[in-house]
Amino acid sequence: GPVRGVIRIRRAISHSTVTQDLVLHADSSRLDFVTAVDWGDERDVLLKAAFPVNIRSQRARYDIQFGSVERPTHWNTPRDFAQFEVAAHKWADLSEGDSGVALLNDCKYGYDVRDNVMRISLLRAPKSPDPSADVNKQHRFTYSILPHDGDYRNGVVRAGYELNVPLLGAVVAASRGKQSAEESLLAVTGDNVVIETMKKAEDDGGIIVRLYEAHGCRGQRTLRTSLPVRRVVETDLMEKEERRLTIRNGRIRLNFRPFQIRTLKFVL
């Protein structure tokens, strides 16, 4: 249809069955592999997906909490060879010059990139510590391939969040409310600052908002809110108050260092 195209593939692998929906959305370069695996009585098997891409780079970048880290794509030393895979959260990216490819996922954390081949670990059947942990069970997960211009800073961080926290649509009845047709509880200027957390404060009725800089850049950004905030206080990660910030017309100006984490408390 006009929203997305889907191709379904079923295949047998060893003692297991894999069903995949290859989903390409309109106006998007992201290709999703929506996967269901009936993981059979496997032993000493590691299921991976591999993507040979037309990109050459000596280093790949991997998503971690509140940032990302670069690692080599070669296994020239015993130390490199021992890291047959590394941990990452929502994506791994391989870029050169003005283009790159990101490999995204919604619940898998084992990656390896060697030369121009990007791989992600999907399921395991080890002998220890628990040989029955995953076998003879059904598993569902999604991973995606995303070609892009530039490097990871050109939309890859956002794409990782869009896959893991997809937009949910809802139909609501019309009303005569006071809100405008478009409204956000929170919004921040710039693509390099992410609103990671919004939650109730642990010790009082305040609202905790945690942001971080995702591209390794310095700069000033403006946080906007439609909440009736009376006071804004910056805290540490334990929510201990450190200093009061200025808010004017629902806007707060914030300076960020590369990969800096900032935690704010809104007093309503």
Outline where the language-model segments fall.
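C-terminal (or distal) subdomains of carbohydrate-active enzymes
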Residues: G1-L268
